[in-house]
Every structure is written in C-alpha cells, then in structure tokens.
Amino acid sequence: YKWLNDTVQAGIAVVDNDNGALIAVGAGRNRKRLREYNYATMIKRHPGSTAKPIFDYGPAIEYLNWSTGKMIIDDKYTYSGGGYLKNWDNSYKGIMTIETALGSSRNIPALQAFQAVSQSQIKTFVTNLGITPEYEDGYINEAHSIGGFNGTNPLEMAAAYATFARGGIYIEPYSFTSAEFLDTGEVYTVTPEKRTVMSEATAYMINIILRNAVTNNYVSAGSKSGTDIASKTGTSTIDSKYIKSLGIKGDVIGDSW
C-alpha cells in the first residue's frame, strides 16, 4: 500500500479475543514526539458501515430473534422524518437475507433493522459494547444505523467486535496486568471483568455473517490471505477518503482508521 502523502493519518488498535488485553496500538503516522495525539484511542470519528452489526443487526437478532435467513427488502426507502436513504452504489437489490444485506453493506436494510428494534433495546445493546451513542431530544438518531455520528475510535470498536468473537462476552481493554508503587511496594493488579452482554447465538450469527462476507468476496481485502477471517469495512459519508476496516483473525481483532 502506498500512502497518498505524509499528512495522511491512521490509527490502529489490536486486542486479544481471549482475554481482552490490548496487544498493539498504532497511534499515528510519522510520530516525532512523545505524547502526541493518539489516533487509535483519542479520536471520535464516524464508524461508517462498521456500525451496522452493533446498532442494527446485532440488536435485531438479540431482541427480535431474527436469523441470518431473515428476509428484508432493499428498495426505495426514507428515514422516519423524511428524506431518502441511498445505498453506496445508488441501486436497489430487492428481497434479500440479512446475511446478504450486512455482508454486502446495504444501507436501506440496515435502517429497517434499526427501526424494527426499540430505542431502549438499541441503547442497551450498544452501551454494553462500550459505545456511546449521540442523542437528539432523548432519541438515538436514525443516522446511527449507517454510522453517521461522531463517537468511536479504533480501540472502542475493536473491543466491541471482539465481543462477537468471544461469544457475547465483553471485556474492557487493558494495557497492563499489574503495577508496583515504588514508594510503598504495594502491587496493583488488574482483574479483567467479563460481562455477558448478548446471547451466544447472536454473537455466533454476526460472526458467521462477517466471515462469509470475506468468503463471498464482499470484503476483498481479506479474501486473499488464505486464512479464516471475519471482516467489516466502512467509509464516511462526510469524507470519502476516511476509511475504516475491522478484522477478526483467530485470537486477535484489529480495527484501523
């Protein structure tokens, strides 16, 4: 890969799927000083389509018992308050399963899934994954369904997606396991808290959809590696040059911005 120029930035976070530990952080490009702005942990950016498993299909599977074979219609559609929503390719594909809809990242089915679940259920599902939505008059705006909000970074998203990989158990990322105070000799130990935030079935189905997205070449970047990968990509509607990519491979998950 060739960078466009030296000013283009990136942030990467990698966590351990098994224990939630933060394995690696790519804070940015061309770092010259200590304590510079960290693009992996400090930014708040649109997650784009990487939000769809979290805000749309995850809650629908968890609370409405949708299966991967649930049929949904990709056709001309509007937000509740009016205004047409478009797909990334400005086309409609008609009736499809949610597996196809999420795998091929269709926007209109994603909004329908978001609308099918109650606001309180979406809030519970999302916040349990460490993501903080934005509110307008007490409501989560429907733009969240396609990642249209400023509110995540690579570390938060990696931790959220790792929950799907480990069967619905969320672990807040941590970067050390113990610390000793020099003046007292007291040792502080980090004990990761594991919380079950969704059913194992929900996590399994999202994981399968993201894995099949690679197998079926919806996500071409991961399909050439010859390894078992689950992945979701996203772009911002505000800036087409802003790209996110999440990948689950074996025992690790990485999110890049």
Residue ranges and their predicted role:
Residues 83-86, 118-159:
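Mid-domain, small-residue-enriched loop/turn segments at the edges of structured enzyme/sensor domains
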Residues 18-19, 29-33, 46, 77-79, ...:
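Solvent-exposed loop/turn segments at secondary-structure junctions
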Residues 1-4, 8-16, 24-27, 32-43, ...:
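A penicillin-recognizing enzyme superfamily signal
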Residues 42-52, 148-151:
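Gly/Ser-rich catalytic serine loop of serine hydrolases
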Residues 20, 46-72, 101, 160-164, ...:
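Active-site SXXK
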Residues 1, 16, 26, 58-64, ...:
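Sec/Tat-exported extracytoplasmic proteins
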Residues 11-15, 22-26, 71, 100, ...:
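Structural recognition of the beta-strand scaffold that forms the well-ordered cores
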Residues 65-122, 141, 170, 182-212, ...:
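Conserved catalytic neighborhood of penicillin-recognizing serine enzymes
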